[in-house]
Amino acid sequence: MKFETWEPVYEEILRDFGFDRAADERARDVAAEYAQAFDLDRLSGINGQTVAIVGAAPSLTDTVERVSGADVTIAASTAADVVREAGYAVDIMVTDLDKNNDTAAELTHEGTIVAAHAHGDNIPAIQSWFPTADRSNVLTTTQAAPIETVDNFGGFTDGDRAAFLADAFGASELIFVGWEFDDPTVDNMKAQKLAWAEKLLYWLENRRGE
């Protein structure tokens, strides 16, 4: 997805949450200080494939075996741990570095691609995590305008960014595993983010004709 298409939605998200665009841009620029140029040809294996988009909902432990029906598995945040513990491979991890950062770093050293996201309130995590990772396996992303070493394929939360990434590189089918949009256990901010994830995925499905 081109940024020109994403930007109006991004601006709506900023208004809804009261987020500061300049803060996102600062985080992007800090991440760029650590990021290496990523060879996007490494994502060509997504093209024409069935891709599992794995969320970290509590139901994941009971449904994780569904990833076996996919050609490529993209796991969001702590879903990567559940997938691996169940004996399945994670091909790409998507994270904004707010939880299982040791897993994210370990995956990069194993050669797995980690899409690490920079946004307005995770600059300290960026500064502490990037030096621990094999940066040749880090795809650095932003929700603001992309720059040379920091990409934007669309999406807001870890989970929906995984779906937008798969779409951007030509996935033929998306399988959603471990997703719950109505989770009474989460706080108001998380509930608002889940509502946006649902809205964004509906938009993406319409764009894909699904």
Residue ranges and their predicted role:
Residues M1-V51, T61-T63, E173, W179, ...:
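N-terminal donor/sugar-recognition subdomains of glycan-related enzymes
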Residues R15-F19, A57, V114-G120:
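Short N-terminal helix-initiation segments at or just after the protein's N-terminus
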Residues D41-L43, T61-E65, T103-A105, L165-A166:
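Short, flexible, glycine/charge-rich loop motifs used to bind or transfer phosphoryl groups or to couple energy/partner
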Residues G45-Q49, I53, A57-R66, A70-K99:
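A glycine-rich, hydrophobic loop/mini-helix early in the fold
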Residues I53-G55, A115-H117, T141, F176-G178:
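Short beta-strand segments
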Residues P58, G120, A144, E180, ...:
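A broadly conserved detector of short glycine/acidic/proline-rich loop/turn motifs that flank catalytic sites
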Residues D71, A80-A171:
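Acidic/Gly/His-enriched mid-domain segments of enzyme catalytic cores or analogous surface patches
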